[in-house]
Amino acid sequence: FLGGIPGRDGFYDLNKNHYAHPIENTVIYRFNASLFFANSKLFQEDIENHLKEDTKTVIVDAGTITNIDITAADTLLMLKNNLEKKGIAFYITEHMQGLNTQLRNLGMGSLIEEGCVRRTITAALLDSGLQKPFPLEGVPADLQENLKELQENAEKALSSHKHNTKNIEKIKKTLWLHTLPAEEENTLEEFAWAFGEDTVNEIEKRV
């Protein structure tokens, strides 16, 4: 399960990062294997067992899911429907475009058409209604804003030391500036990623 670190971009394993906090009202689940009949039940149970009363969004980081079979595809659809009944939005993100093709071939194109498939975790969070910096459990909002201001000041400090590599690395380490960029735009590129060879047909349907 993933969360955020105050003042930093990107998403981090909650069990491996002491400073990581869950994003409010959100479950971000990374599944580190292809999804098929033998492990799809575990996948579903892991997510459902981690839900809280205030959970509003579930996001799957499917970056390592390269293949999926019909049983697993059915599980995804069942999970999505179960979550919808509870008022919880469901997203699949971070995977290669080929997985979208597999979903369509298995008759699960509705997941794409209904917006459940997004290119990045950040895009899913923004689509769910959250804004950056994303609110973290147990972290006051004003602290997040203060850290943002601190980063801006740090960037000025970095520019004044641009010829001193040692000072730059020291400032970065002190102020947590090892940030990871995250894509967030809802663009034609993402649309093409989602629909693959069917992109033109899908665009024509919407014109």
Show which residues each predicted segment covers.
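STAS-like cytosolic regulatory interaction modules
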Residues: 26, 48-49, 84-196, 200-206
